[in-house]
Amino acid sequence: MDPTDLAFAGAAAQARMLADGALTAPMLLEVYLQRIERLDSHLRAYRVVQFDRARAEAEAAQQRLDAGERLPLLGVPIAIKDDVDIAGEVTTYGSAGHGPAATSDAEVVRRLRAAGAVIIGKTNVPELMIMPFTESLAFGATRNPWCLNRTPGGSSGGSAAAVAAGLAPVALGSDGGGSIRIPCTWCGLFGLKPQRDRISLEPHDGAWQGLSVNGPIARSVMDAALLLDATTTVPGPEGEFVAAAARQPGRLRIALSTRVPTPLPVRCGKQELAAVHQAGALLRDLGHDVVVRDPDYPASTYANYLPRFFRGISDDADAQAHPDRLEARTRAIARLGSFFSDRRMAALRAAEVVLSSRIQSIFDDVDVVVTPGAATGPSRIGAYQRRGAVSTLLLVVQRVPYFQVWNLTGQPAAVVPWDFDGDGLPMSVQLVGRPYDEATLLALAAQIESARPWAHRRPSVS
């Protein structure tokens, strides 16, 4: 197979080739390392690439394959977001304020290694994962492989840029307010925010006051399912998510909703709105019952989300070895968060139950809710460079208003690549499922992928 085609083949196909002996783990890794050396100076997807260590891991994986061992990801390379600990490597959180190297792997990394994955390196993030654009004073700007003067999104922007450009077959991201779904939308990828606590955050349990989760960034639904099966901590049948991605979803009742959950005035783009109704037409053609209905978003939704968001950032800032080295904008946001007490956080966490029940009441009648992905396309690199904390947040939330509410409720939500906007940049629609029902989202997303394939699309920088 041509090296470029191999780079874009996807993790599931690569795992099969490795198991069948049609490919070796060192050969596959070298495809990615060579592409990184050639392309990543343009993108800055990676903060660090572990060339020697990854090569040693690939050699060890091949020895296990040669000995007849078979694991779901044995020999498959993966990129890790730089808010997740890898033993012997610094976790920077996109900041100059970081401390020394981690002494042990995070639980999610341990699970990936147990499944046989080869760790390529760590991907870039905005400082403390705050913004939906991946730019920091410490590590520069990560660029979108579809258009180099645009952001890939954030905060998992490095992970998404790497997968989109064929610098990794799959990547680990995290999502506390859209940080998987935003960059997957703008990079043309499938991204899944799993159910809260589906994947371990250890040693950073409770990140962002319960809002944040880890999850997969992938070219295809099957690749994401493979990663989810390898990392889930919730007991269930072995391989349940790969099985879900391979089955038909059955006839579902699906609600289309374009109502913006935020109290701020937001104008969603015409193409982004049209994508929802186009998705509805396709879903009807596929045999589903489709209605137009909005969830009940209480006015207090963001009064619950925002204090937890700000306090989470304040906690992260306090945990830095050198908080004085944080960017001024980050310090300002952290100061806002410091005004919210532990008692206030406990009250908000308790109130979440009632809020979530009200928002989730729509799922008494429907299986899945479809919304726009982002409201507009990605910002230009440096667009917010001279802005302060509050003005930046007010502007960026208008681009991505459909994501945060589902971090509050904790249920799974995925973005499915749809089309391209007038600037030739990817768009998506968001699928929201019932609590703990990633399986239905994966089955439905795979059905959409079969009807409207996207994994073959390659950006200009690839």
Curated annotation (Swiss-Prot):
Molecular function via GO: amidase activity
EC assignment: 3.5.1.4
Pfam family, one: Amidase
Matches recorded under SUPFAM superfamilies: Amidase signature (AS) enzymes (SSF75304)
Coiled coil: none
Recorded superkingdom: Bacteria
Enzyme class: hydrolase
Keywords attached to this entry: Hydrolase
Keyword Hydrolase appears in the UniProt entry: yes
Known catalytic reactions: a monocarboxylic acid amide + H2O = a monocarboxylate + NH4(+)
Catalytic center residues: 81, 155, 179
Family: Belongs to the amidase family.
Misc note: Was identified as a high-confidence drug target.
Protein name in the entry: Putative amidase AmiB2
Phylogenetic classification of the source organism: Bacteria, Bacillati, Actinomycetota, Actinomycetes, Mycobacteriales
